[in-house]
Each structure stands twice: as structure tokens, then as C-alpha cells.
Amino acid sequence: MKEFIAKFSPLNFLMLLAAGIINAIGVTLFIAPVQLYDSGISGTSILLSQLTPDYLSLSFFLILLNIPLLLFGFKRQGAVFSIYAIFTVCVYSVAAWLITDVLPIDVSIASPLSGTDLFLCALFGGIISGVGSGLAIRYGGAMDGIEVVAVIFAKPLGLSVGTFVLIYNVLLYMICGIVMGSWILPLYSIVTYAAGSKTVDFIVDGLDSAKAAMIITTHPDEIARAVSEEFGTGLTIID
């Protein structure tokens, strides 16, 4: 038990706490108030929160959709990664709930650019949420269950992880456009996705590229699990 606990780092938990809060700020103050959509499960949660009664909030769907996916990936990704990821998602969900439902804040007014410039909302929302997601990955967790799903199902479908996530988001934005009866907001959401993706790449690789490594192996599952448990970091499997 002590050996297992020793695998976790207080610094990682602190940075994942910050990551969840930062991501919640980006989504609740820049993206959601102007009806834009984040990527992955976060974007799916935003859409569902728009289509359901008010008491089914964004934070409710974040937990409802993300936690089962992260638990589903427990065996593939290892205990350390799964616990870090679940912690991050819970922080993100609670922070989003506090901002939108508890604190005396009118989010539509508090959003600096709400109702004035959709492009800037999309851009800065993507950058801020990208910082949160990047920090989550950098310190061994994940902000979105779609990453776990991609790692598990991309290979059987003959796709890379990045391509799987891209296809999911394209389908998500198409569904948003059809359901909401407008393509303007889904198209602006692509800006959010692009800005977020570039920011994640910069946070994960750009600040410390010397520690990036590619491992070529015929046993990806075993190595991914061992590296995740030993170093507390996330991995991307490229087929």
C-alpha cells in the first residue's frame, strides 16, 4: 500500500487542481455563455446541458459522462493515471458548478467578451481551456474521457488517436449544428478546438521538449501501463 501511495506526487495533485480550475474558467466564462462548444466530452456536456432542464447542469454531465469512461480505461492506462484523471475531472466539474450555480456571478455578464465578439470568445476560451488540458496531461492526468476512449478504440478501427479525436469532434460539431439549427456557433467552435489543441501541444511539448520521447515496441499496452504507473505521466499510442 505504501509503495502504491508513493507513486503519487503532491505537486502533481496541486497542478491538476490548478488545471481543473483553469479549464473551468475558460469554459464557463468564455465558451458556454455564448453557446460555443468545447471539444470532446466537455463539448458533448455543453450540448446536453443546453437541451435539458436547468437542474441538469454542465457539471452534472461532465461527471456523468467522464467518470465511467475513465474507469473503463483503468486497466489500459493504469491506476495512477486513472486516479489523477478522475481527480482532475472532479475538480473541473466542481469548479464549473461553483462558477455557474453557486457563486453570485452572472456568467453571461462576467464573461469579458460575452455577446460582443464570438471570435475572441472562441479564441481565448480555447487558449485558456487548452492551458488547463495541457497542464492535466503534463502532470499525469487528463481533462477529458475522450482521450481514454481514443486510446482504446482507435487501433481496432485502424485510426491514430489524433484522428479518432478529430473525427469525434467533427461529428459533435455537425450534431450541434443540426440540433441547434445554426452552423455559425459550431463553426466558431472549430476555432476554439484549434486554439485549444495548439495550446495543449505547447504546454505538453513546447516548454520542455527535451523530455519528450518516442518508444518503439511490440508491447505498447504493457509499456504504457508501466510508464504511467512509474512516472505518473500520460502517453499517446501511435499505430
Where are these regions (language model features)?
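Core subunits and conserved enzymes of cellular information-processing
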Residues: 2-221, 230
